[in-house]
Amino acid sequence: FVVGLEIKREVVRGALSNRKTASLPVIAAFGGMVVPAMIYASINWDNDIALRGWAIPAATDIAFAVGVLALLGSRVPPALKVFLLALAIIDDLGAILIIAFFYSSGLSVSALALAAAGIALLALLNRSNVLRVWPYLLVGAIVWLCVLKSGVHATLAGVATALAVPLTGVKKGQEGPLESLENRLSPWVSFVILPIFAFANAGVSLTGLSAAQVVSPIPLGIALGLFIGKPLGIYTCARVAISSGIGAMPAGASQVQLFGTAILGGIGFTMSLFIGMLAFHGPLESAEVRVGVLAGSLMSAVVGYLVLARHRTV
């Protein structure tokens, strides 16, 4: 839901409101999802069960990636921070769509029809300029329940509800319903919900895991997908977009800083763990997922920080 609020704000007023500025993170995010998935799939190609985890290294954790970049303060240009935020938001939307379409089963047409009717009602509320938040939350809760019962992952309902919430307030310059909700919910999500989820899922027990299993195809594919695939996909696609004139280089940023930011895109953590939880249910595979996610995310955070810390803004 909060990701949906962030997406709408950025599209209407933020970094994604300008076509050329928006093109760069969109194209970079695409590369940052495709290349890690390809690396994971190439390593696990001969194992149908392991292939279920192809989307695990395709995710970026907004809070952790932006948090590491924030530690650098004025050593990185503001435009680069906006680029990473937009990239992570688009990446999260891609992850949500992947979850909805590839990790859902047993679709119920009647439940989907009711969810579609609820989404239409949300659109009607928006078109009618209803500025109170509770009607959106009430209808959104019903849509969430219908989507959950339909067999499609319910994260999609949160995004749909958020996109319907009005951005502007009653008076010009007044905080609108969307920004009010985002300001209230973001601290809870960033400092309570995400840390609880991370701590609950990040505990890696190596009991029963041999040294060979720690570097087996599943954790190896995830770690390499995050640490190698993410920066390779993000930076390469960003360079193509800039060279072709489709996208614009973040103001004040150097090529090295762009690459360092691409490395930070490999911090998958919470979203990668979440996809891993949906892909695998066995204790052995779950432990391997955690090893791969933590290894890839930690290497991305440390190396990305060091690359950016050693280079100043141009």
Predicted ranges, named:
Residues 69, 73-166:
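Functional cores that coordinate and move charged inorganic groups
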Residues 18-27, 47-59, 76-86, 215-224, ...:
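The feature identifies polytopic integral membrane transport proteins across all domains of life
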